[in-house]
């Protein structure tokens, strides 16, 4: 066997001494490459990756088995790359790279700075590999360990020889089993004969595996060569080298798992259509059903009380405050929407509606003191500061400027949906309860209090309290049904408002409903008596209350916004006139 020459003399002796510090069985240096770098083929990324190994490559012979090997003395770190040359190695030359695959089925590439050294080392590696294969085949048979080649060197204990023998025995034991029984990753990497195509691989794959040059005399089936992997390109898919031992067992298990997955999909697809939807709309009144399906408006069903078991009580809550001609009346329809929601949330509330019950509102000409106290359902739970909190319907009582001027159907669907969303958001806020006692309504009316749920419940000064009919707070069980509601009176007729001089009317404390007296349509109010000056003046609004009042009026009262805008334009013109002067 001809071995190419390399550096000789004293330099080689120094290198041999350095190599023997790592492996004392090295006998001599066969060849040397001055500058190389090691690359590894990434299995998952399907590309070459540079390692931290870079330096001089030494090909040497050993006095123990394996007889030959090569080492890259790393210049970057203390970790060198050592690979024994055995019959399981496979080399392929692609200038300036020398590709090889070891017994663990790992693919590496050695980059050479000098192309002549690359060709020389590649020829040497192939010759040494063929020599090891011939020795293993003619010495003890195919697949046997080349331990017998070193038997003439004495009976000294060699740990590397013992490890090689144990590995070969383990390899022979594993080749007798079926590939699908090998499931551990260590067995796949440690078994060089695992990718033989005998049990499962089709016969056409044998034609794809061409034998390496010089191996025609070996009757044993060989691994996939690097020529088939990297014959025409530097980067080939790693699945061709490591695919058969991993994909073949999965192909056998796939027909078993596939029907089970299909069964799961079928069961899910059959069960989904049979999921029953919650029957919410079946137990609701027609008015609530129309509200849930986003109807254009709430149409009255009939004019006779006998044909309206439940609808008029609900319509008195939503259509009464909402059917006005001013923009403010649209903002005051939220208590009615709140009442509709609360009847839906309380089970059996639609069954408690009594047809033929008296109307919940009084006439414009009949005093309330001559009749029974007006029965109103309050949306205030125990100790709740606002009537639009949780969980009872809102009072259907009217406020100033809420006489039924126009017919039903004035509320637009967009306005109705907006109020519904606002009521649902307020119902989710936790609020302390308020005992269901008789509530006295001083200056603030029911409609104004319903527009601000966060307003604190304030009593008027003692001097302003006069005997007035009490609006009793009832549960939803006592919601009565009524005929067509008569014209409604303003509650200001029955409650003495706080007195303020006419010239200071704008400075007087606003009601908790945040209504602006200047923005209120005067055509819809009844004439009121001029109150006498009380003994103590009313308390002023806080900053938070004033802010909420202004925001509410700007968002819901177009007349108030127009007044502010006109004042703003007037101030601009006045400022411009002053600047010109």
UniProtKB/Swiss-Prot annotation:
Keyword Phosphoprotein attached: yes
UniProt keyword Hydrolase present: yes
Top enzyme class: hydrolase
InterPro entries for this protein: Dcp1, mRNA_decap_C, PH-like_dom_sf
Reactions the enzyme catalyzes: a 5'-end (N(7)-methyl 5'-triphosphoguanosine)-ribonucleoside in mRNA + H2O = N(7)-methyl-GDP + a 5'-end phospho-ribonucleoside in mRNA + 2 H(+)
Record localization: Cytoplasm; Nucleus
Comp. bias (Polar residues): 204-219, 368-381
Alphabetized CDD domains for the sequence: Dcp1 (cd09804)
Residue list for modification Phosphoserine: 145, 269, 326, 412, 475
One record GO biological process: deadenylation-dependent decapping of nuclear-transcribed mRNA
Gene Ontology CC entries for this record: nucleus; P-body
Pfam family, one: mRNA_decap_C
Modified residues annotated as Phosphothreonine in this record: 366
Record family assignment: Belongs to the DCP1 family.
Entry protein name: mRNA-decapping enzyme 1B
Organism of derivation: Bos taurus (Bovine)
Taxonomy of the source species: Eukaryota, Metazoa, Chordata, Craniata, Vertebrata
């Amino acid at each position: 066997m001809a071995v190419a020459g390399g550096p000789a003399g004293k330099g080689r002796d120094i290198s041999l001494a350095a190599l023997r510090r790592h492996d004392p069985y090295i006998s001599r240096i066969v060849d040397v490459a001055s500058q190389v770098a090691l690359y590894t083929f990434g299995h998952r990324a399907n590309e070459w990756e540079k390692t931290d190994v870079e330096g001089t490559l030494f090909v040497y012979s050993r006095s123990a088995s394996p007889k030959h090997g090569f080492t890259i003395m790393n210049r970057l770190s203390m970790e060198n790359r050592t690979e024994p040359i055995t019959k399981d190695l496979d080399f392929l030359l692609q200038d300036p790279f020398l590709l090889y695959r070891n017994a663990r089925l790992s693919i590496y590439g050695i980059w050479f700075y000098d192309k002549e050294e690359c060709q020389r080392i590649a020829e040497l590696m192939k010759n040494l590999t063929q020599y090891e294969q011939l020795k293993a085949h003619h010495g003890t048979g195919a697949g046997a360990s080349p331990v017998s080649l070193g038997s003439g060197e004495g009976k000294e204990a060699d740990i590397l020889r013992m490890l090689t023998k144990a590995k070969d025995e383990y390899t022979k034991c594993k080749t007798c089993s079926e590939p699908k029984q090998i499931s551990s990753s260590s067995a796949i990497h440690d078994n060089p004969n695992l990718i033989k195509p005998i049990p499962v691989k089709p016969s056409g794959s044998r034609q794809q595996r061409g034998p390496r040059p010089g191996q025609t005399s070996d009757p044993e089936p060989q691994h996939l060569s690097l020529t088939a992997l990297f014959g025409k390109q530097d980067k080939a898919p790693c699945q061709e080298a490591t695919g058969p031992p991993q994909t073949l067992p999965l192909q056998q298990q796939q027909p078993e798992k596939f029907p089970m997955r299909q069964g799961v999909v079928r069961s899910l697809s059959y069960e989904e259509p049979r999921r029953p939807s919650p029957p919410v709309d079946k137990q609701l009144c027609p008015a609530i059903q129309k509200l849930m399906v986003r109807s254009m408006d709430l149409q009255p069903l009939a004019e006779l009380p006998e044909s309206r078991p439940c609808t008029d009580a609900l319509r008195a809550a939503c259509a009464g405050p909402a059917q006005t001609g001013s923009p403010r009346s649209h903002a005051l329809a939220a208590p009615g929407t709140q009442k509709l929601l609360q009847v839906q949330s309380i089970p059996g509330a639609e069954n408690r509606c009594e047809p033929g019950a008296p109307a919940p509102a009084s006439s414009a000409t009949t005093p309330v003191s001559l009749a029974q106290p007006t029965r109103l359902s309050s949306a205030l739970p125990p100790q709740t500061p606002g009537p639009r909190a949780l969980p009872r319907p809102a009072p259907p009582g009217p406020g100033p400027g809420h006489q039924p001027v126009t017919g039903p159907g004035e509320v637009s669907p967009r306005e109705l949906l907006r109020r519904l969303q606002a009521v649902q958001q307020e119902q989710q806020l936790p609020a302390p309860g308020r005992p269901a006692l008789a509530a006295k309504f001083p200056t603030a009316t029911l409609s104004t209090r319903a527009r601000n749920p966060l307003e604190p419940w304030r009593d008027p000064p003692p001097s302003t309290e006069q005997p007035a009919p009490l609006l009793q707070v009832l549960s939803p069980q006592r919601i009565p049904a009524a005929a067509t509601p008569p014209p409604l009176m303003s509650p200001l007729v029955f409650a003495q408002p706080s007195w303020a001089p006419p010239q200071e009317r704008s400075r007087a404390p606003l009601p908790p409903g945040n209504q602006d007296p200047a923005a209120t349509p005067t055509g819809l109010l009844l004439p009121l008596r001029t109150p006498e000056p009380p003994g103590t003046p009313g308390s002023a609004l806080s900053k938070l209350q004033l802010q909420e009042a202004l925001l509410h009026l700007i968002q819901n009262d177009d007349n108030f916004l127009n007044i502010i805008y006109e004042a703003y334009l007037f101030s601009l013109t006045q400022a411009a006139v002053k600047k010109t002067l």
